[in-house]
């Protein structure tokens, strides 16, 4: 994300340089973006995908709202009820209110976690309904190939949490009613916020 933004301005940097920047400033930037973000949608798409970390298999759990904004990510060793419950607990702590609808694939862990937590949320389980969450994993796959796989679980969690918040900032939900001028204004607002955050942290 950052290297693409710089490339648009004719500045070329290596992935290693971006990685060092992310390690130094990433958490601070992502926390500030999250605090400034508006309330997200009330329809949560939850999904999990396999990632390889230092030769071991982990599960990357991700939640996305109906507009394509990533709500949160969690790298875990398992794919059971407790893992699903950890993700839901993390989501509920940062949410303004519980979701209206929760959409997942047919993995039984989600329903078990919902019952255990006594969540009164409509739960829809259908493979075809969850394409939004599945599509959100695609940038992770591309990054894995570039970075030659993550070196540790902590590195993966830190990188993905940071990357998804930055991606959220520049994400413009598709709508046939959004004009080109409106999209341009949203993009300029995102760059303005990024400029404010980066200048503030670099000056500190």
Segments predicted by a language model, with ranges:
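DNA-recognition alpha helix
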Residues: 1-11
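Mobile genetic element proteins and their domesticated derivatives, centered on retroelements
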Residues: 2, 18, 47, 63, ...
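Short, basic alpha-helical nucleic acid-contact segments in DNA-binding proteins
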Residues: 12, 20-42
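Active-site beta-loop-alpha junctions of metal-dependent nucleic acid enzymes
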Residues: 20, 24, 73-95
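Two-metal-ion RNase H-like nuclease active-site motif
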Residues: 40-53
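Acidic/histidine-rich, metal-coordinating catalytic segments
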Residues: 99-110, 127
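RNase H-like two-metal-ion nuclease catalytic core shared by retroviral integrases
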Residues: 126-142, 156-157
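C-terminal domain-tail junction helix/linker
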Residues: 146-148, 157-204
């Amino acid at each position: 994300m950052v290297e693409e933004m710089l490339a648009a301005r004719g500045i070329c940097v290596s992935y290693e340089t971006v990685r060092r920047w992310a390690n130094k400033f990433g958490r601070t930037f992502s926390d500030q973006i999250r605090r400034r973000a508006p309330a997200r949608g009330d329809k949560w798409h939850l999904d999990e995908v396999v990632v390889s970390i230092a030769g071991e298999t982990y599960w990357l759990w991700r939640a996305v709202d109906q507009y394509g904004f990533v709500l949160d990510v969690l790298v875990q060793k398992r794919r059971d009820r407790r893992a699903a419950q950890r993700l839901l607990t993390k989501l509920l702590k940062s949410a303004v209110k519980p979701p209206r609808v929760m959409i997942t694939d047919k993995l039984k862990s989600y329903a078990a976690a919902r019952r255990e937590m006594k969540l009164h949320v409509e739960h829809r389980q259908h493979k075809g309904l969850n394409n939004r969450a599945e599509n959100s994993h695609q940038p992770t796959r591309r990054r894995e190939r570039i970075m030659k796989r993550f070196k540790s679980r902590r590195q993966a969690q830190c990188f993905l949490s940071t990357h998804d918040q930055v991606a959220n900032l520049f994400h413009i939900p598709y709508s046939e009613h959004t004009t080109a001028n409106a999209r341009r204004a949203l993009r300029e607002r995102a760059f303005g916020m990024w400029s404010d955050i980066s200048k503030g942290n670099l000056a500190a």
